[in-house]
Every structure is written in structure tokens, then in C-alpha cells.
């Protein structure tokens, strides 16, 4: 299956070449494919905060490359570059508050910086580390796809209907995708009859990005309104909900695209299985439960306006980007380190003690 998956990779949103970070502007998809080139850390931080690049793994990868750009500038400034670089770590860390992968990538880059030896080519070493973060995410995607397919096959081997929410595909990662990686792999195995994609308001990551990715791969896909998810579960024979994650707490609670929680509640009511697919870098053992995860809110214009035109009266707006799905609503968490069924704190701790693959 691995060779099939690698051959099927058709979409990428992150490229590093010619000493610059190149990002596919996800705000414009699918109508326009425009690549933005970032040559300094401020541009990378802005690209993250303004949703040019999104998806927790992709944000972490972009931040790692952003530090390489920052380091190049600081080294050129001369003495005191280590202290100045701390400002760049802070800038990138403040770009988005929720994705655990962002802080994981920054910490990994910091740790590599601290292990430098006299005579090392600092810039070359740190560039190699950022590339390794990118490549390891791609490898993790392939491994998770295989693990996820095994879970689906174990419970039902015939063709079936799946539901996903948000975008956890190639655009959100460094490779094949997390949730969409599993869905793509299941399709290659002849196990998917239909994929239903929630539009995922207000940024429409489902209808704009996920549907575009799956259609490009020839996966049978149908877009539905977010509010139709419960009705679909009742009438369309869906067997699995498969989603990604921005952050997973130590007890298995999952922060993900807003609307994931209510889908999980509906799935539990209808007896459907609920799968979360995310690399181990999305797990933060310093966060005991979902109550400890910082949850991002965004600007009012995302709900008040459509295509720049105000369509709602001037009223109070609350625009959370993510919500928390409690672990007891989740059947399985799939990572590159392994699979956790019916997650809890003990199982998550055991998973994270395994040999580091990512």
C-alpha cells in the first residue's frame, strides 16, 4: 500500500527551495492557485496568522522554516544573534495559539540549536533540521494512513460511507494528510463508497479544500452543510467519522476544527465510530485535559461578511476557531507511533513512551 500512497500524492502546499519558503495561498483555493514566497520570519508569521497556511502539522513545518530564515538574518547582523533569535521564536509562537505542532516544532528547533558544537555550520545544521521535520511528517502521514485503514477494515471490510470535517489533508500537512490520508488509503483499498464533507464554516475548509483535494484524487465526494451532519448519520448509512486534530491533551481530549464536538456527540448518538488522526507532535502531555488547551477565536468579519460584503447586522459576534471533543466520545486516535482505542491518560502516556518515530 505504501507505494500506492506515495504514487497518489498529487497536492502539496509547502515547498522549500532557493533559500525561501513557498506557500500555496489556501485563502484563494480552489478558484486560484497562487504561491507566496516568504524570505523572512515576519512573512512566515503573518502567513500563519492570516491563514495562508493552516493545519497544525503544516503550521509547525512552516514555523521551522521560518526560524531558518530568521537565523540567516540574525547571523548576518553579527554578535548577539542568539538573543535576537529569541524574538523570532516568540513571534512565531504567537502566530496561532492552539496548534500543538507549532510549539513542538519550535521546541525541536530550539533543542537542535542548543546541541550545536564548535565549528558547526549553524545555518546548514538548522536548515537540515527543518527539512527533517518536513520529511518526518510526510513519513508519519503514510504510516497513519496504513494504521487507519486497518482500523476501518477491522470493523467493516466492505465499501462504506465516511464523514469528515475541516481539512486534514495534504494542504494541512507535509505529506498525504492525516484524516484524508486514511480516507485516501481506504479508497485505494476499495473500501469507500462515498465521502461526505462538511463545508466547515466560516472558512469553508471542507467545501473549498477537502472537496478539492479528494475530487483531484478521484474520490467520490459530496459536500454537505455543517448542520446536515446529524441528518446524514441518520439517513445515509455512514459508518465512520474521520477527522484531524490541532491539539490532543494528555487524557485524550481533542481540540479540532470548530463543529467537531457536535459531530462527535451526534456520532455517539447514532452508534457511529469516531476516529481522530494526528501525528504524535499534536499531543501535548503538559496539557492535562481539554480544559487546558488554549482555544483560538478570530475576527468578527469572518461571520459578518461574505466575500467582503457585510451580510449580517451589527451585532455581537463570537467566533471560536476550535472546540474540544472529550476523549469519551472518541473510539480511536491514530498516530504514527500506534493506535489508541478508547483513549485515556494512561493509554496516551503509554503511546508517548514508545520509540520516537516522528
Curated annotation (Swiss-Prot):
Please, which domain of life does this record's source organism belong to?
Bacteria
**Pathway(s) annotated for this protein in UniProt:** Amino-acid biosynthesis; L-methionine biosynthesis via salvage pathway; L-methionine from S-methyl-5-thio-alpha-D-ribose 1-phosphate: step 1/6
- Point out the signal peptide segment: none
Principal EC category: isomerase
Keyword match Cell membrane: no
| Record key words, sorted | Amino-acid biosynthesis, Isomerase, Methionine biosynthesis
Record keywords: Cell membrane included?
Answer: no
Task: Name the InterPro entries on file.
Answer: IF-2B-related, IF-M1Pi, IF_2B-like_C, Initiation_fac_2B_a/b/d, M1Pi_N, NagB/RpiA_transferase-like
Positions of substrate binding: 54-56, 96, 205, 256-257
Q: Which SUPFAM superfamilies match?
A: NagB/RpiA/CoA transferase-like
Which residues are named in the active-site annotation? 246 (proton donor)
Q: Catalyses which reaction? A: 5-(methylsulfanyl)-alpha-D-ribose 1-phosphate = 5-(methylsulfanyl)-D-ribulose 1-phosphate
Q: What GO molecular function terms would the record report?
A: S-methyl-5-thioribose-1-phosphate isomerase activity
The UniProt record lists the EC number as 5.3.1.23
**Coiled coil spans:** none
GO BP annotations of the record are:
L-methionine salvage from methylthioadenosine
| Primary role | Catalyzes the interconversion of methylthioribose-1-phosphate (MTR-1-P) into methylthioribulose-1-phosphate (MTRu-1-P).
By sequence similarity, the record places it as follows:
Belongs to the eIF-2B alpha/beta/delta subunits family. MtnA subfamily.
- Recorded protein name is Methylthioribose-1-phosphate isomerase
Which species is this record about? Answer: Pseudomonas entomophila (strain L48)
Phylogenetic placement of the source organism: Bacteria, Pseudomonadati, Pseudomonadota, Gammaproteobacteria, Pseudomonadales
What is the primary gene name for this protein?
mtnA
